């Protein structure tokens, strides 16, 4: 189960001091519910002491930002906030409590939320994309898997191992994806990006099929986008459709929870061996040990 961070703040400066943390949580897919204070509803829009439009400020950097103006709305708003924060691709939610919603009394009735209209937390898996991904991997001579935090968020560590082991594919991990694959696993070739290891970084531009799983191709991993893995066919597994083609053009997009999509593709993979390709990482590993 995904745990949620809970942040409480008073009005004005303390609310605004949460902005950087909220933005980081959005980028890092960290579920957080921020409980913030606001002036009473009768003072909204009057530039009252310590009034700030926290909802307007945080809408671009949250999954949901909502102002609670009545005590009667607290139960359903809090339930919805926790559901949205932890479902699908996790992220931050802000609840801006007007003062009267904080101090008024109302009868509490427990509310459970497992659906929000127009909110689709997990896209439906597409069989055609599963088939296309498997075909590309089965035909690959130099496949490389890029492992992101989405594997951990989707609790798909076992599915990832089965996936790379069946097709004998080397893997590199992003900073937030390092815990998805044991460091001692023979197919784990280290960390990607500007602070990462030589092997996965250099061979990103030598592989023929690049498989990204639950990662967003940020600039610390890709460097110059115009030349990044330009020789490779790219498969992108992700739960968030907004990440597809955002930074790197994808040949096959596999949408859905990677626990399910990895398992589905693995079923279609042919057992393979890529000894020569795996051996190409050894010189870089030896250089780093010296």
Where are these regions (language model features)?
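Anionic-ligand anchoring segments at beta-strand to alpha-helix junctions in alpha/beta enzyme folds, i.e.
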Residues: 9, 34-37, 125-126, 132-210
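Short glycine/serine/threonine-rich phosphate/pyrophosphate-binding segments
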Residues: 14-22, 26, 153-156, 218-223
